[in-house]
Amino acid sequence: MFRIVKWLIALPVGIFIFFNAYVYGNIITYRAVAPHRTAFMSMRMKQFEQEGRDVALDYRWVPYNRISTNLKKALIASEDVRFAGHGGFDWDGIQNAIRRNRNSGEVKAGGSTISQQLAKNLFLNESRNYLRKGEEAAITAMMEAVTDKNRIFELYLNSIEWHYGVFGAEAASRYFYKKPAADLTKQQAAKLTALVPAPLYYADHPKSKRLRNKTNIVLRRMGSAELPESDTD
């Protein structure tokens, strides 16, 4: 009996260690190499297949300096205004999320920073529970420890979901505006950013009033967004 208990404890611990060793190795690789595709992309494409949707993956990696500063500022203004200065976690946002989750009785809000969102996109899935949030935090800490802010942001910009099968700034810019991501205007960048929290909902409701309102809010805020110090755009 004792041996069985030992195995029941050792097995999940071993899986946790193995998975995080795998993740860490990939984080080191991604400092210089673009991901072939992310875990979230694979999960989403499998979901579309199961739903009987004929969706092709449109994912086009471009370097950081070929993405409009307008889009960078819009995303920071909307998703993580403290991105340039924090170590991967926005503690005020996390405390607010905990309060909202406690009031609702389930994990709805995550207080996720850009770094945390990237951790989810690269390695995890859409599930909302405290175990997954803990793993997300561990990956975020590893990534922030060995990867500079510009590279984290570059990975994020290239992995965001924007429509059915459309991932990354370049694919989104060409899908919506028939132009490279480097040429996005402020209005276009704000509109793309407004899609980020719920891209598939807005794909089905493109004339949503909420989308228009969010676009206008992003436009007002993006001028004061602070990019990482090493940004040379």
From Swiss-Prot:
Q: State the EC number(s).
A: 2.4.99.28
Membrane topology category:
Single-pass membrane protein
Q: Which Gene3D superfamilies match?
A: Biosynthetic peptidoglycan transglycosylase-like
Q: What is its main location?
A: membrane
Give the superkingdom in one word: Bacteria
One GO term (biological process): cell wall organization
Location of the protein in the cell: Cell inner membrane
Q: In which pathway does it act?
A: Cell wall biogenesis; peptidoglycan biosynthesis
Per the UniProt record, which residue ranges are transmembrane?
A: 8-28
What sections of the sequence does the record tag as coiled-coil?
none
Matching entries from NCBIfam families are given as: mono_pep_trsgly
What does the UniProt function comment say about this protein?
Answer: Peptidoglycan polymerase that catalyzes glycan chain elongation from lipid-linked precursors.
Family that this chain belongs to: Belongs to the glycosyltransferase 51 family.
Give the protein's recorded name: Biosynthetic peptidoglycan transglycosylase
